[in-house]
Amino acid sequence: MGKYFGTDGVRGVAGADLTCELAMKLGRGAAAVLTGSTGHRPRILIGKDTRQSGDMLEAALTAGLCSVGADVESLGVLPTPAVAYLVKKYNADAGVVISASHNPMEFNGIKIFAGTGYKLPDEVENEIEKHIDNNCADIPLATCAEVGRVSVRADGLDDYVDHLYEAIHGDLTGLNVCIDCANGASAAVAQKLFPRLGAKCTFLGVSPDGANINKGVGSTHLDNLEKAVVAGGFDCGIAFDGDADRCLACDELGQEMDGDKVIALLALAMKEKGRLDGDTAVVTVMSNLGFIKYMESQGVHTEKTAVGDRYVLENMRENGFAIGGEQSGHVILLHHATTGDGELTAGKLLKLLAESGKKMSELNGIYAQYPQVLVNVTANAAQKAAYKEDEVLAGFIENEQQKLMGMGRVLVRISGTEPKIRVMVEGQDLEAIDRCAKRIVERIEQRILKQ
């Protein structure tokens, strides 16, 4: 991670950490790095989620881009994966998404896609950061007719829905589904796509007001969806986050289906049809041991990366694998998309359910998960830095790992998108791992929270 860019773009509290000044510099730096050698007037797409701060940041970002001669096409509110798809379809030089994904509304973020539709590699982000630190002093400003123009593009929604419809290529007739759009960017797409595929749909979280994105709804608040599914007698529930790059589900009994379960089901379906390249699924170190063991028993190898869908994608592209993702619900289907796409994932999962003739609870029960305890410790940048340098703390955590005697594992990591240190302990004995997690959290708080 760099000074400004985390694992998923630049992110922070809008107006405090992520200011208009920073957004403008980011626009200038990105335009210079991404389009400096194109030899033509660059075109940049901008999409956003439903946060109140999105308009403010889009205006600042647009000013930065236009000030160095780039034309901007505003797509309005669209999911992150829609921008990734459209930047390539429209032959644009880059695409920018203004969103903080699953975070509360006070946060916002800026993530950038190259003209290929893929997120920027670390080295390109580092070049942009150098320009920001230099106040973009070495980037010439456009004048007169060289200044970029701004236009609104209204066809993005329908073009993206058409793409998803063709990629899913399924008939969902007979399914009764409850879909939670998190009061975010997925609402317009979902309300067009899933009924078109034949599903009977009831929608939650489709009334964004700028402040209610992810507020008690969406993939980070599944309890409301789970209750609604049981009370309404739905076949299953689907939940997206604020920018719809992730998808979680629940079965008809209200039981959660995390990203591991979704990846397992889709990967095995692909394997059965001969489409699972390398018979491999790429996941992160957070994936459940029950998932890993089950996939191995089914002849599917699992590649494990650091946490972050960008690292999953890098492994997939380097090795030619077709599916990967995270327990949190990011699922990348590389035959159809260049990034995690919640609505594509949901469509593929619902197609599998419709074709199986089974209940979702039967699909959800394909393997038993090992118990996991996940605790988040709030930590600012200085406290995160102190954690990384604390050898005593590292030794304590290693000792806790040894106490599990090979019957579990400990994973403590710094979040790249939130001011948190995440403590995850996994094993067969829930009481033992719960005690272990509490000891680690207590020691972290004792040693670094004074920073």
Regions found by a protein language model. Name each.
Residues 47-48, 179-181, 251, 335, ...:
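Short glycine-centered, acidic/aromatic-flanked micro-motifs in structured strand/loop junctions
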Residues 236, 273-451:
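Phosphate-binding and adjacent anionic-ligand microenvironments
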Residues 13, 108-232:
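Gly/Ser/Thr-enriched, mixed-charge loops and adjacent short helices
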Residues 39-49, 73, 176-178, 279-285, ...:
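Short glycine-rich phosphate-binding loop at a beta-alpha junction
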Residues 32, 36, 40-108, 192-250:
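N-terminal small/polar loop signature for handling phosphorylated ligands or for N-terminal nucleophile
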Residues 1-63, 67-68, 150-175, 384-385, ...:
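An N-terminal, well-structured beta->alpha segment
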Residues 82, 126-161, 166, 252-325, ...:
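Proline/glycine-rich low-complexity loops and linkers
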